[in-house]
């Protein structure tokens, strides 16, 4: 009975609403004044390639590539490290850049990088960025003894956030030099923290043609002030040490992470080529943060789950019927591969209105 109840619970996590992008009703977004926060002067990287003999896939040559970051990215050796799934097929192919959830879960990026490569059968090149080091070391920040150490720790974390965004832009520089990559069809996908990073990259780099943001948001200071679990542990520990209330904490991160807010780059996104996946009961990304990202990106296509922050990831598993994975793949097929807009999507048809499954 316990197993049956568990399967029923997990299977229920496939319920969601799929909303189409409506260009007729979308409002024109004013172009923001853009500070050059994510600018850089480093040349296009020339990565070292290394073999991955036990990670090969049919239709691909899978190898590793790495090069020094031009910033301080907090990753091992201060390197940019990625797995490159290069198609064996002739001709220029699109590139999908898959972002990690730094120093946290590898499951979502593993499913998308390996799964989409196999799904397309060699019609897309895939670059899976690695992320073994944290951007925000929650436990280290939680243990700061005083305000000076707190400022230093947050400054370093925000610097790493900016650094990995620049690392991604330099991966795009590299992609433009590759004869097998069609650099007019570059997509990016991020999850949670990397959805936030990815949205800042897309808002600053017009070479990003297609973007998927899974369980991300804007207004990162609200996330810092309201997210649960390890972020809440850090917040409570620091607040006790510094004798701050929640609003002081929120105000501090509003200043420190002002350039990490995707809403700054409104008017720079391509809403017709953007997919947002969110949870209406997300206990890490507040409602105002979710709404701000949706509005800043031009009210694009959106999938909404009625769950918390982690439950939609269950829809990327066989128990959850891979519903979320299939929706993401179908969107990428349409945008990167030019599949027909009216292609049937499993058990539902995406229309100009809303479709609920």
Cite the ranges covered by each PLM segment:
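Gly/Ser-rich "nucleophile elbow"/oxyanion-hole loop immediately N-terminal to the catalytic nucleophile
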Residues: 148-192
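Cap/lid segment of the alpha/beta-hydrolase catalytic domain
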Residues: 103-165
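Hydrolase active-site cap/lid region
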Residues: 200-248, 304
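N-terminal cap/lid segment of alpha/beta-hydrolase-fold proteins
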Residues: 43-90
